[in-house]
């Protein structure tokens, strides 16, 4: 049987067998606790340059289909994939092939047969770190593999939004009669998931998806009713262009909504700082408290950076008073910020789910109300 190894920056090595393509994959080792939704995870652009370790013991049971991908063209964005027990066959009426076949087709290097529980416990105690998956011709002496892992760029300080953003603007038309829309939204693609424009379309909104390099002047030409900041990979401390753009949007009084990376961008635009978490939040059952109502939503999340702040914290900004609106019930991490006057808000989690619960989908309706002038 062929051999594959997962090598961590601190020298820990886990031995298994190849899964998917063979060769070398370098990235940051992170773990995802979702028991389902692996296709959505693999195709989420926020996982760019990360090696995802699945905590669920069996992966691939439902194969691969043409409907659940969260990227255009079904592109897999993870750098590598580590699993315990991959299913050798697909068992689902929508499946068009197996997970391993798709990994091979897209040349994603993976590893199977390792003790993923041990990997996750290690990452929980030591933190997410540089890693590599090696098999076949990429195998070498442990010291050489560790050196390769350590030589790669850290996620801290990585500016990645431009690597996953669309190169050209495109439009997602609203559902319903052609040419009829309630509102127009300018969505900045920092790594947007395809289910987000779908949520706008279902609400009768025309969504212009724009490159991460878009200027305020280009947004203003669209005369949008609102601006959306998407999820995405990398360190938000490097996203100075998007932060400056967000401040221009706020200064113009255009309603604004942000998700995940977009939450960190809005927070920075309002004066908060960000930090790299020890191992982040990646899963589909993470509880979040809304401090305006006291209600808890079970949410889907994928982030390794967060905003500095505390529950209910109020702070002054050039655009008026703001508040930390949401925090994680597990560890108190900031999960949302907003301007008190309501014209800009964001959350760290994913109300569009895909995969995950739909507890927070109402936030899209809140944005619609804001654009209609009812939420001011």
Swiss-Prot record:
CDD domains: GATase1_CPSase. The active site is at 260 (nucleophile), 350, 352. SUPFAM superfamilies: Carbamoyl phosphate synthetase, small subunit N-terminal domain, Class I glutamine amidotransferase-like. Composed of two chains; the small (or glutamine) chain promotes the hydrolysis of glutamine to ammonia, which is used by the large (or ammonia) chain to synthesize carbamoyl phosphate. Tetramer of heterodimers (alpha,beta)4. One of its GO terms (molecular function) is carbamoyl-phosphate synthase (glutamine-hydrolyzing) activity. This is Carbamoyl phosphate synthase small chain. It catalyses: hydrogencarbonate + L-glutamine + 2 ATP + H2O = carbamoyl phosphate + L-glutamate + 2 ADP + phosphate + 2 H(+). Gene3D superfamilies: 3.40.50.880, Carbamoyl-phosphate synthase small subunit, N-terminal domain (3.50.30.20). GO terms for cellular component: carbamoyl-phosphate synthase complex; cytoplasm. Its EC number is 6.3.5.5. Residues 1-183 are annotated as: CPSase. Small subunit of the glutamine-dependent carbamoyl phosphate synthetase (CPSase). CPSase catalyzes the formation of carbamoyl phosphate from the ammonia moiety of glutamine, carbonate, and phosphate donated by ATP, constituting the first step of 2 biosynthetic pathways, one leading to arginine and/or urea and the other to pyrimidine nucleotides. The small subunit (glutamine amidotransferase) binds and cleaves glutamine to supply the large subunit with the substrate ammonia. Keywords: Amino-acid biosynthesis, Arginine biosynthesis, ATP-binding, Glutamine amidotransferase, Ligase, Nucleotide-binding, Pyrimidine biosynthesis. Belongs to the CarA family. Residues 184-376 form the Glutamine amidotransferase type-1 domain. InterPro entries: Anth_synth/Amidotransfase, CarbamoylP_synth_ssu, CarbamoylP_synth_ssu_N, CarbP_synth_ssu_N_sf, Class_I_gatase-like, CPSase_GATase1, GATASE. It comes from the Bacteria. Transmembrane segments: none annotated. PROSITE patterns: GATASE_TYPE_1. Pathway: Amino-acid biosynthesis; L-arginine biosynthesis; carbamoyl phosphate from bicarbonate: step 1/1; Pyrimidine metabolism; UMP biosynthesis via de novo pathway; (S)-dihydroorotate from bicarbonate: step 1/3. GO terms for biological process: 'de novo' pyrimidine nucleobase biosynthetic process; 'de novo' UMP biosynthetic process; glutamine metabolic process; L-arginine biosynthetic process. L-glutamine binds at residues 46, 232, 234, 261, 264, 302, 304-305.
């Amino acid at each position: 049987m062929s051999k594959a190894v997962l090598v961590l920056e601190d020298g820990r090595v886990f031995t298994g067998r190849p899964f998917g393509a063979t060769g070398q994959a370098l990235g940051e080792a992170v773990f995802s606790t979702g028991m389902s939704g692996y296709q959505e995870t693999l195709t989420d652009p926020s996982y760019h340059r990360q090696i995802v370790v699945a905590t669920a013991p069996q992966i691939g049971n439902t194969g691969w289909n043409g409907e659940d991908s969260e990227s255009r063209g079904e592109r897999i964005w993870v750098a590598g994939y580590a699993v315990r027990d991959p299913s050798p066959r697909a068992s689902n009426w929508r499946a068009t092939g197996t997970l391993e076949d798709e990994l091979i087709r897209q040349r994603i290097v993976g590893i199977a047969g390792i003790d993923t529980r041990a990997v996750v416990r290690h990452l929980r105690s030591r933190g997410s770190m540089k890693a590599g998956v090696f098999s076949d011709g990429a195998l070498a002496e442990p010291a050489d593999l560790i050196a390769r892992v350590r030589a790669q760029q850290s996620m801290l300080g990585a500016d990645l939004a431009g690597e996953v953003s669309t190169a050209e603007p495109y439009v997602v038309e609203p559902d319903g009669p052609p040419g009829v829309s309630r509102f127009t939204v300018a969505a900045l693609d920092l790594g947007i998931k395809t289910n987000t424009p779908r949520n706008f379309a279902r609400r009768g909104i025309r969504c212009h998806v724009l490159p991460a390099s878009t200027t305020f002047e280009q947004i203003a030409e669209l005369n949008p009713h609102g601006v959306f900041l998407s999820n995405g990979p990398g360190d938000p401390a490097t996203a100075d262009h998007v932060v400056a753009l967000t401040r221009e949007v706020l200064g113009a009084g255009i309603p604004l909504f942000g998700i995940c990376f977009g939450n960190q961008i809005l927070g920075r635009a309002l004066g908060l700082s960000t930090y790299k978490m020890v191992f982040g939040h990646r899963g589909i059952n993470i509880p979040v408290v809304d401090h305006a109502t006291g209600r808890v939503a079970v949410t889907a999340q994928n982030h390794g950076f967060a905003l500095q702040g505390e529950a209910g914290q109020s702070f002054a900004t050039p655009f008026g008073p703001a508040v930390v609106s949401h925090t994680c019930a597990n560890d108190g991490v900031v999960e949302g910020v907003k301007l008190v006057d309501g014209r800009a808000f964001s959350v760290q989690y994913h109300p569009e789910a895909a995969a995950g619960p739909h507890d927070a989908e109402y936030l899209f309706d809140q944005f619609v109300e804001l654009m209609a002038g009812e939420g001011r």
